[in-house]
C-alpha cells in the first residue's frame, strides 16, 4: 500500500480544480512514511483518491502533483509521454519562428512540476527545482536519452530554491559532450552566443524572445538605452531595427563582453553600440543630472521579489527605476518595461508604472502589453505560471 497524504476537511477544492500544489496547511496527516521527493497518493479527509504527487516534508508546498489519473504510474513511460506532449507544441513554434532553441519543459504548465528544460541546439539544459524532480532524476534522464538521442544533457540545478527543500546545488554534464564556452543559437534572424555553463539561469532568457522582436518596431533612427542588458539580446534586436545608437548597461563585464561579440557576430555597426559597466540605478540618476535624453528605454531588471515579505520593497524598487527612466525619455519616447517576479501581478505592475509616471511629472500611455514567449505556456489551472509581464509605454 502506498503512502497517503490525507487532506484536512474542505481543503480538497484546489485539487478538484486541478491545481498542482498542496500546501502544508491543507494537510491533516500522513499515513505511512515517505522520503524526500517520494511519490505519494493524495486523498481527501474521507479517503477518496485525488492525485498522485511528490512529497516534500520541509517545504510549504508539501506535495506537487504529477498526475490526476489514478491509473498513471510515475515512471520512465510517464516522463516519455510528458516530453512527447511538450515537444509537439515546440515543434510547431520552432517551425513557425525559425527557432533552434526553446523551453522544452516549463514545469507545472507542462505537467512536470519543478522541472525546467531548455533546448539550445543539440544541448538540453536541465534544472530540477523540487524534491520530487530530484527523486525522479534517473527516470527523467532515461526518458530524455530515449527521446533525444542526438542531444547532450547538462545540469544547471545550481539554484538557491533547492535549499528550501533540503537539496544541494548541482551542476555539470550528465550525458554527452560538454557545451562549448559560448554556443551560437538563432532567434528571429539574430545569432546569439549562449553561456550554458556559467550564464544566468540555463544560460539565456528565452522567455523574452517575443519582446526582443517587438522592440524593433519602436527603434528606427532612435537613441536606445538598454538597462540590465545581460548579453545584449535587446541591443542586437535594436540594431537590427535600425536604431541610431544603443547604450547597454550591466554590472557584469563578462556579460557586456558577450554582448559586444553578439553585435559583431551579426555583422552590425559596432560604432552604434556602447557598453557601460555600472549600477543601473546610479547611472540613471547620473544621466538625469547630466540631462541625457533617450528615445527608447528597455528596462528588464532581475527578479526584485522572492517572497511576499519582499513585495513592498520590490514595489518601491520598480517604481523608482521606472520613474528615472520616464524622466530620461524625450516627449513621444517609448519605455519598454518588464517584471519577471511571479508575485508581481500584471495589474499591480501597471499601477506601479502609473505611479512612477506621476512622480516623474509625465503623462504615460500604455500602448502594448507583453508576456513570456509561447514556449513558456501557462496552464489554465496554474495561473502562477504567468510570471513575466511587460508594457510598452509612450511618454508624453
Curated annotation (Swiss-Prot):
The protein's location, in the record's own words, is: Cytoplasm
Instruction: Supply the Pfam families for this chain.
Output: Methyltrans_SAM, PUA_3
EC numbers for this chain: 2.1.1.191
User: Does the record's keyword annotation contain RNA-binding?
Assistant: yes
> What SUPFAM superfamilies is this protein classified in?
PUA domain-like (SSF88697), S-adenosyl-L-methionine-dependent methyltransferases (SSF53335)
Residue stretches making up the PUA domain: 2-79
> Which class of enzymes does this protein belong to?
transferase
* Keyword rRNA processing on entry: yes
Q: What is its main location?
A: cytoplasm
Keywords for the protein's UniProt record, in alphabetical order: Cytoplasm, Methyltransferase, RNA-binding, rRNA processing, S-adenosyl-L-methionine, Transferase
GO MF, one term, reads: rRNA (cytosine) methyltransferase activity
Q: Which reaction does it catalyse?
A: cytidine(1962) in 23S rRNA + S-adenosyl-L-methionine = 5-methylcytidine(1962) in 23S rRNA + S-adenosyl-L-homocysteine + H(+)
- Superkingdom in the source lineage: Bacteria
Q: Name one GO cellular component term.
A: cytoplasm
Similarity annotation: Belongs to the methyltransferase superfamily. RlmI family.
Main function? Specifically methylates the cytosine at position 1962 (m5C1962) of 23S rRNA.
PANTHER family named among the record's database cross-references: RIBOSOMAL RNA LARGE SUBUNIT METHYLTRANSFERASE, S-ADENOSYLMETHIONINE-DEPENDENT METHYLTRANSFERASE DOMAIN-CONTAINING PROTEIN
* UniProt xrefs under HAMAP family: 23SrRNA_methyltr_I
Q: Quote the protein name from its UniProt record.
A: Ribosomal RNA large subunit methyltransferase I
Q: What is the lineage of its organism?
A: Bacteria, Pseudomonadati, Pseudomonadota, Gammaproteobacteria, Enterobacterales
Amino acid at each position: 500500500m502506498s503512502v497517503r497524504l490525507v487532506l484536512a476537511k474542505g481543503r480538497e477544492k484546489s485539487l478538484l480544480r486541478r491545481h498542482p500544489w498542496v500546501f502544508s496547511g491543507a494537510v491533516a496527516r500522513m499515513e505511512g512514511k515517505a522520503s524526500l521527493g517520494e511519490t505519494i497518493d493524495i486523498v481527501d479527509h474521507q479517503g477518496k483518491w485525488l492525485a498522485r504527487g511528490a512529497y516534500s516534508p520541509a517545504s510549504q508546498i508539501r506535495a506537487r502533483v504529477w498526475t490526476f489519473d489514478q491509473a498513471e504510474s510515475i515512471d520512465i513511460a510517464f516522463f516519455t509521454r510528458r516530453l512527447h506532449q511538450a515537444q509537439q507544441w515546440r515543434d510547431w513554434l520552432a517551425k513557425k519562428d525559425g527557432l533552434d532553441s526553446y523551453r522544452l519543459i516549463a514545469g507545472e504548465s507542462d505537467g512536470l512540476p519543478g522541472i525546467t528544460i531548455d533546448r539550445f541546439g543539440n544541448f538540453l539544459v536541465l534544472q530540477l527545482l523540487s524534491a520530487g524532480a530530484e527523486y525522479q532524476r534517473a527516470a527523467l534522464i532515461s526518458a530524455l536519452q530515449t527521446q533525444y538521442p542526438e542531444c547532450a544533457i547538462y545540469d544547471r540545478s545550481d539554484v538557491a530554491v533547492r535549499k528550501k527543500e533540503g537539496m544541494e546545488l548541482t551542476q555539470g554534464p550528465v550525458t554527452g559532450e560538454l557545451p562549448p564556452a559560448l554556443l551560437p543559437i538563432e532567434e528571429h534572424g539574430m545569432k546569439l552566443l549562449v553561456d550554458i555553463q556559467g550564464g544566468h539561469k540555463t544560460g539565456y532568457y528565452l522567455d523574452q524572445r517575443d519582446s526582443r522582436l517587438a522592440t524593433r518596431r519602436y527603434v528606427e533612427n532612435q537613441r536606445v538605452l538598454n538597462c540590465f542588458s545581460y548579453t545584449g539580446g535587446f541591443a542586437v534586436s535594436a540594431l537590427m531595427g535600425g536604431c541610431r545608437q544603443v547604450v547597454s548597461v550591466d554590472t557584469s563585464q563578462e556579460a557586456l563582453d558577450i554582448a559586444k561579440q553578439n553585435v559583431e557576430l551579426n555583422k552590425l555597426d559596432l560604432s552604434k553600440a556602447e557598453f557601460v559597466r555600472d549600477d543601473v540605478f546610479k547611472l540613471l540618476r547620473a544621466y538625469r543630472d547630466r540631462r541625457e535624453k533617450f528615445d527608447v528605454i528597455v528596462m528588464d531588471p532581475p527578479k526584485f521579489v522572492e517572497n511576499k515579505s519582499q513585495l513592498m520593497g520590490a514595489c518601491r524598487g520598480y517604481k523608482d527605476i521606472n520613474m528615472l527612466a520616464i524622466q530620461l525619455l524625450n516627449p513621444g519616447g517609448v519605455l519598454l518595461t518588464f517584471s519577471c517576479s511571479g508575485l508581481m501581478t500584471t495589474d499591480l505592475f501597471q499601477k506601479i508604472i502609473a505611479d512612477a509616471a506621476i512622480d516623474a511629472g509625465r503623462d504615460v500611455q500604455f500602448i502594448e502589453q507583453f508576456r513570456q514567449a509561447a514556449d513558456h505556456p501557462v496552464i489554465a489551472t496554474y495561473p502562477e505560471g504567468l510570471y513575466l509581464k511587460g508594457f510598452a509605454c509612450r511618454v508624453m
